[in-house]
Design a protein with these regions (language model features):
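Residue-level signal for pocket-adjacent positions within structured domains
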Residues: 13-14, 75-78, 96, 123, ...
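Conserved active-site and cofactor/substrate-binding residues in soluble primary-metabolism enzymes
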Residues: 23, 27, 50, 96-102, ...
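Helix-loop-strand module that forms the ligand-binding subsite of alpha/beta enzymes
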Residues: 70-118
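Phosphate-binding/catalytic loops
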Residues: 101-184
Length: 184
């Protein structure tokens, strides 16, 4: 079931590709979305760039949100962070941009529009400076971050879009199968 005509799950890549490691969220999004994988049609991939609060309307009405970003928590550069509860990092201004993701999520919560499930996969940046190449530690962390993002995306999709809504019978269910309207 789509909410307000939107896919229930949004994968949001954020950052500035012109500031080296700050663009890692966009790189993760690019590597995740077109990889030839048959992702569920209930998922939308969005390059949020540096739009900040302008993204409020894009996340409103979703059931789940996976954010891909540079995350600065003071760990070693290239450390992959998987944050299943965004409020844990909100006070630390975790993202590497001025208009950060925590602010976006806090405002959407105040407006009653924050998705029920929000997770963040990010990589600790090494160098935020003019340039388009990722630093070596961040580039080396991409495969691990992609693996974490894939796993979380599957988890979020299962939580946000139950199988019966997708017209499939759950494996562990012995109840009647739900047949989508028009398929009888």
């Amino acid at each position: 079931m789509r909410t307000r005509g939107k896919a229930p799950v949004l994968v949001l890549g954020v950052g500035n590709a012109l500031l080296r490691d700050d663009g890692v969220g966009l790189r993760l999004l690019s590597d995740l979305s077109p990889e030839g994988r048959s992702w569920d049609a209930e998922i939308e991939f969005l390059d949020g760039g540096t739009q900040g609060l302008a993204l409020l309307g894009r996340i409103a009405g979703r059931r789940a949100l996976l954010i891909l970003d540079a995350v600065n928590l003071g760990a070693a550069p290239g450390t992959v962070h998987v944050l299943r509860e965004w409020r844990d990092c909100a006070a630390r201004s975790a993202t590497a941009h001025e208009s950060n993701v925590s602010e976006l999520l806090a405002v959407s919560t105040l407006l009653g529009e924050c998705p029920e499930k929000v997770a963040i996969v990010g990589i600790e940046p090494h160098r935020i400076a003019t340039g388009m190449e990722l630093s070596d530690p961040v580039a080396r962390a991409l495969p691990a971050a992609l693996e974490a993002a894939r796993g979380l995306l599957l988890e979020l999709t299962e939580a946000a879009v139950p199988e019966v809504e997708r017209g499939r019978k759950p494996v562990d269910s012995f109840g009647p199968m739900v047949i989508p309207f028009g398929m009888r």
